[in-house]
Swiss-Prot record:
Protein name as annotated: UPF0434 protein Rmet_0534
InterPro entries, per the entry: Trm112-like
One Gene Ontology term, aspect cellular component: cytosol
Family recorded in the similarity comment: Belongs to the UPF0434 family.
Transmembrane segments: none
N-terminal signal peptide: none
A Pfam family hit: Trm112p
PANTHER family: PROTEIN PREY, MITOCHONDRIAL, ZGC:162634
Length: 69
């Protein structure tokens, strides 16, 4: 990930600083406890694509159940 890009990217929800996780290919917002994926070298900065994080590991965000089920 380009350091210049990392310096200007912020969390789309809180506008906070992001941390690059090279191994997981994600940008982490510690304030919102979200991990944004990097796909083919491109950060996907959409809240719907982010995963919730817990200390020490990342877990997928559970989709909402459809109404009426």
């Amino acid at each position: 990930m380009d350091n210049r890009l990392l310096e200007i990217l912020v969390c789309p929800l809180c506008k906070g600083k992001l941390e690059y996780d090279r191994a997981a290919q994600e940008l982490i917002c510690h304030a919102d406890k979200l991990a944004y994926p990097i796909r083919d070298g491109i950060p996907v900065m959409l809240a719907d694509e982010a995963r919730q994080t817990v200390p020490g590991r990342v877990v997928p965000v559970e989709p909402s159940a459809p109404a009426g089920n």
